[in-house]
Amino acid sequence: MASQGTKRSYEQMETGGERQNTTEIRASVGRMIGGIGRFYIQMCTELKLSDYEGRLIQNSITIERMVLSAFDERRNKYLEEHPSAGKDPKKTGGPIYRRIDGKWIRELILYDKEEISRIWRQANNGEDATAGLTHMMIWHSNLNDATYQRTRALVRTGMDPRMCSLMQGSTLPRRSGAAGAAVKGVGTMVMELIRMIKRGINDRNFWRGENGRRTRIAYERMCNILKGKFQTAAQKAMMDQVRESRNPGNAEIEDLIFLARSALILRGSVAHKSCLPACVYGLAVASGHDFEREGYSLVGIDPFRLLQNSQVFSLIRPNENPAHKSQLVWMACHSAAFEDLRVSSFIRGKRVVPRGQLSTRGVQIASNENMETMDSSTLELRSRYWAIRTRSGGNTNQQRASAGQISVQPTFSVQRNLPFERATIMAAFTGNTEGRTSDMRTEIIRIMESARPEDVSFQGRGVFELSDEKATSPIVPSFDMSNEGSYFFGDNAEEYDN
């Protein structure tokens, strides 16, 4: 599935299209974005939200979650077959925040899923528009990536918390399709596979019978997706071994963890897309922007341009720093949770600080939080420059290792050196090179040892002025090469608990 011959651009994955030319891709992505915008406007009308309330990111998230829940076929079916107390399987809802007499009031709303899906289809020319749904899932996933740490999840599967930069997309639902698979990090795929193998170890029937056959197909497909993310022959060969294993068990788990570690230096190809909150698209559509006619790209200037002239608000808790809240959302909008802070800061034109130094909690407000003390402020989502999003891990000239960047997975295609402590990483590889994958392991370790930290990734690539929409004159930034900029150092973020 993810073999070399079938590489499609993100936009094709995003819109389910086969090979199209750039104009067609831009138009179909534009159609998807326009549909989200029209849906959002309609929902604001239904809920009688004022202009200000419609620009509140928390309201946007509730509306996005409602439509995602309305179209979650498997969960809806499950809810109908296993009725739980106090949950109506046919309804969906969430908190809507309204500004009344200078105070923010939380109102819990409930809608028929039928009704929501009708409004969604109507906004999307009567189609299901799965691409638009996936797009919103990726925005939520990017927001989670920027907000929470996954240390516990990593440790539970036997991985190391230092592998956090490989965990992009770890909260994406399984149903997110090809576009979702493209944005998942190596660690996310490894974690999904390990969970599957562990179930097989504990449950004799997991791989058996008709269900087991389907499980097996899913397993092999996930292996192929992961294989497609690796860029060296040895890593790919090792994935073939894992995929072809008759009865996946601890040996495969070992191999997968080895591969995940190796991805700290031999980075995988992980796609990055700027997915914005629905209210941003709604604002643009409301102001008369025709996305389908103008065309749109998730990896170019368009999202930057959109954020330059959109005003979005957020609720702020009493001791949160609005500038920090803005940084969090900016990172989520550009899928930059795992990007080098030096690069992000340069593009944003403001210093981007590591998560451990942020005085802000997540964007969503829990139902037990006190609304009396809530304030709201404008999110500063503008940038100084724009840059093209990348789908490569930033290894210099493929097939040869370069010092990929530990604890960073590049988002922007911008030249930088990749400072990393090879000793720290290589220490993780002492010991086990026996077994049937020994020659591949030896080869992978050899490639990593020859990696040079002084290599430059994305040679000659730069950022662009916001007036330079055709990306004609790149500005290649020079970074202070000594310090590495991982967002996760000194981390004290909350865990993501589903």
Curated annotation (Swiss-Prot):
It is found in: Virion; Host nucleus. InterPro entries: Flu_NP. Late in virus-infected cells, may be cleaved from a 56-kDa protein to a 53-kDa protein by a cellular caspase. This cleavage might be a marker for the onset of apoptosis in infected cells or have a specific function in virus host interaction. Residues 1-23 are annotated as: Disordered. GO terms for biological process: symbiont entry into host cell; viral penetration into host nucleus. GO terms for molecular function: RNA binding; structural molecule activity. A motif (Bipartite nuclear localization signal) lies at residues 198-216. This is Nucleoprotein. It comes from Influenza A virus (strain A/Swine/Iowa/1976/1931 H1N1).
